[in-house]
Design a protein with these regions (language model features):
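Flexible, compositionally biased loop and terminal segments
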Residues: 1-236
């Protein structure tokens, strides 16, 4: 029996953020090159997006490419960029049919003109969709997100306050994550949504991202469901 059958939907996390870790290790364990792991990871994302939508999750954020990932081997970086461009183009019709709204969080500065064009065209066409919001964090870093927000706040002539910094972050219309999932068994945040996850519940899965499935997502949500979120208050 799935989570959706066990629990009331108003008790489920509205926003799940995922650090999709383990693609390279998954490939290495199978004697493949790292890029094959990224290709398999794309398939996992499609599966988890559909299941999250089925459960009634409103927002799904995924850490696809960090500002630090440019340091990886050139072939791997080029493959990730190619896969991302291909993913956006190939999934457009599915996203439109499934009423998925796609947004991209991150810096555009190092991305090619063709990739930026694809991002702008696809996200603009999906902007009015009212279903689950898929937030792909690409060329993203939590520190950069905060830094850019502070710069924008100053440029707008606004006071440096928590509210103003929050509203000037990438895609700030998305509420803070209720649940942060990291796959691959590592207990690290890796510069992901540093501002937004201040009070998020964290679940670390030992499964590598390509092996992550609906059952494991159920386990993570079950863990969230059974926690007492106090936001700094004491238990009564």
């Amino acid at each position: 029996m799935s989570i959706s059958q066990n629990y009331m939907k108003d008790k489920l996390p509205k926003h799940i953020a995922i650090i999709m870790d383990g693609n390279g290790r998954w490939a290495k364990k199978r004697g493949m090159i790292r890029t094959e792991g990224h290709k398999k990871g794309v398939e996992t994302l499609e599966k988890i997006l559909k299941y999250s939508d089925k459960l009634g999750i409103k927002y799904l954020s995924v850490y696809a490419f960090s500002t630090e990932n440019w340091k990886r081997p050139k072939l791997e970086v080029e493959t990730i960029l190619m896969l991302f461009n291909k993913y956006l183009k190939s999934k457009f019709n599915d996203f439109m049919e499934q009423n998925v709204r796609l947004v991209i969080s991150g810096s555009r500065e190092r991305l090619s003109k063709s990739l930026n064009k694809t991002i702008n065209e696809i996200t603009n066409k999906l902007e009015n969709n009212t279903g689950i919001v898929l937030n792909i964090c690409f060329n993203y870093g939590g520190r950069l997100d905060i830094l850019e927000s502070i710069k924008k706040t100053i440029e707008n002539g606004e006071d440096i306050t928590e509210d103003n910094i929050s509203k000037n972050l990438y895609n700030s219309f998305i509420p803070n994550p209720d649940l942060l999932i990291r796959t691959g068994g590592e207990f690290r945040i890796s510069n992901y949504m540093l501002w937004q996850i201040a009070y998020s519940e964290i679940y670390v899965s030992d499964l590598l991202w390509p092996d992550f499935d609906e059952k494991e997502l159920d386990k993570s949500i079950n863990s969230f469901y059974n926690r007492d979120r106090r936001y700094g208050n004491v238990e009564e």
